Regions:
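Glycine-rich phosphate-binding active-site loops on the catalytic face of alpha/beta enzymes
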Residues: 125-144, 182-192, 229-252, 276-288, ...
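Catalytic cores of alpha/beta
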Residues: 118-130, 165-176, 213-235, 240, ...
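Hydrophobic faces of well-ordered beta-strands that scaffold small-molecule active sites
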Residues: 50-54, 84-86, 111-114, 134-136, ...
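N-terminal small/glycine-rich loop or linker at the start of catalytic domains
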Residues: 42-63, 96-102, 147, 245-256
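N-terminal active-site wall of soluble small-molecule enzyme domains
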Residues: 60-154, 161, 169-172, 198-201, ...
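An N-cap/entry alpha-helix motif that binds or orients negatively charged groups
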Residues: 1-67
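Active-site/ligand-binding-proximal alpha/beta "capping" segment
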Residues: 178-258, 376-413, 422-425
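C-terminal helical cap(s) of enzyme catalytic domains, especially alpha/beta-barrels
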Residues: 195-205, 227, 239-260, 293-302, ...
């Protein structure tokens, strides 16, 4: 143990001694009662588990979330998490034990105290502040320390997340009969990230051990792929760095998905509640899903999706007016708009409004080399055909700024998601008739996307 980790642990020993003076164990130990929230049960089962983390700062990134409100964060996480992790280290993560009860009060899930635990005092303190589980790191503890600390936690019905970061620690975790093993993809000695650590270490753990992949997971594509190796994920920074936390969680758990062709307020509500991030409003008069500005305003008022206006060869002035009047998150161009058109649009469009370009895929993949285009939507033909193109064309492509469209529904959305696109664009495949979205079909596609 050296470098960053050694310094953190040395400082933690100083902190523990100071805290013992300030808040002696004898002053609160008789108020510490065993928890009723079972960490092990919360992570068990066939569905991939998510431990979502409340994290204000870190040594590698500095301040991550300036507007850090643990109760508000828990209010979002409680809809998605299996358990919630709370950073309690003060010096390096700007954490606090005071955050634990704030989160526990809002969310019914087990709360994990994320600290560099080296002393039984910290476990009693964590439970006193309403934690239901604690982190024990084999990079920090020898076997005897681990057994002692684990026994204290279990005496309070608390769960233990046993963290390993290499083969030697993994072998120790197996010998120590750890129930939940977290494989840290970050090397705390030099702060580097390697997702291969999960791929190589996880298969060594036997049946009955819950494997959690920690650190460096940012995308739905990574989650889907690593879910073959791990039973769950601990995710913090990838969520905390986004202002819209709800959308950030959806992006990682489900993908960056859009429901296009919304015409009625109730459809937007179902799309949002099911897990969509974007809602598409079509301003192409010939489309059976076309809306006027008043209809669009009614849809927008009904649900807090990020709204995308869809246009085809419209005058630049019209696109800009709609984007401003409706506070659109993006405009999607579905016609023959070229670089000159896009440059003119970008010059006048509010800075926060993205430009998306739909591309028709035939026998080959068209180039994606336009300036000022934030995302591409790959579709079969001019869109709205309900037909898919040959997805094998996507193999080996960088698709991080691509949404996939064309005939997507519950029967093929998983195959589409495996392409590695940032997200999927649903339309006709979730309708009962053109322009009328079907609530059960919408719910079904998002349940299917989450079934991994």
């Amino acid at each position: 143990m050296q470098t960053v980790l050694a310094k953190i642990v040395a400082d933690k020993a100083i902190w523990v001694e100071a805290r013992k003076q300030q808040q002696p164990l004898a002053s609160f130990q008789n108020e510490v009662v065993p928890t009723q929230r079972n960490f092990y049960d919360a992570l068990a089962g066939t569905r991939t588990a998510f431990i979502l983390e409340c994290k204000k700062a870190s040594p590698s990134k500095g301040l991550i979330r300036e507007d850090f409100d643990p109760a508000a964060i828990a209010g979002v996480y409680k809809h998605y998490a299996s358990a919630i992790s709370v950073l309690c280290d003060e010096k390096y993560f700007q954490g606090s034990f005071d955050f634990l009860p704030m989160v526990s009060k809002v969310a019914p899930q087990p709360i994990l105290c994320k600290d560099f635990t080296i002393d039984p005092y910290q476990i009693y303190l964590a439970r006193y502040y309403q934690a239901d589980a604690c982190l024990l790191m084999l990079s920090v503890l020898d076997d005897e320390q681990y057994r002692q600390l684990s026994a204290v936690a279990h005496s309070l019905n608390m769960g233990v997340l046993t963290e390993v970061s290499n083969e030697e620690e993994l072998e120790r975790a197996i010998a120590l009969k750890a129930k939940v093993v977290g494989i840290n993809n970050r090397d705390l000695r030099d702060m580097s990230i390697d997702l291969n650590r999960t791929r190589t270490l996880a298969p060594r753990l036997g049946h009955g051990v819950t494997v959690i992949s920690e650190s460096g997971i940012h995308t739905y594509a990574e989650v889907r792929e690593l879910s073959h190796f791990a039973n769950g994920f601990l995710i913090g920074s990838a969520l905390m760095e986004h202002d819209d936390l709800n959308a950030a969680v959806k992006r990682v758990l489900l993908g960056e998905n859009k429901v296009c062709g919304l015409t009625r307020p109730q459809e937007a509500q179902v799309a949002y509640e099911s897990g969509a991030i974007y809602g598409g409003l079509i301003f192409v008069p010939t489309s059976p899903r076309a809306v006027n500005e008043a209809q669009a305003q009614a849809v927008i008022a009904s649900a807090p999706l990020s709204y995308v206006g869809v246009f085809r060869n419209s005058p630049v002035a019209e696109v800009i007016a709609r984007a401003k009047n409706l506070s659109l998150a993006a405009v999607q161009l579905h016609g023959s708009e070229d670089q000159t058109y896009i440059d003119a649009l970008r010059a006048e469009l509010p800075g926060k409004v993205q430009i998306w370009k739909a591309l028709s895929v035939g026998e080959t993949l068209p180039p994606r080399n336009l300036n000022h285009v934030d995302k591409y939507v790959l579709d079969n033909g001019q869109g709205g055909t309900g037909q898919r193109f040959d997805w094998s064309l996507l193999q080996g492509q960088d698709l991080r700024n691509v949404l996939l469209a064309g005939g997507l529904g519950a029967d093929n959305c998983v195959e589409a998601a495996k392409s590695g696109c940032a997200g999927l664009d649903f339309n006709s495949g979730v309708e009962s008739q053109p322009g009328i979205k079907d609530a059960s079909k919408l719910a079904s596609v998002f349940q299917t996307l989450r079934a991994y």
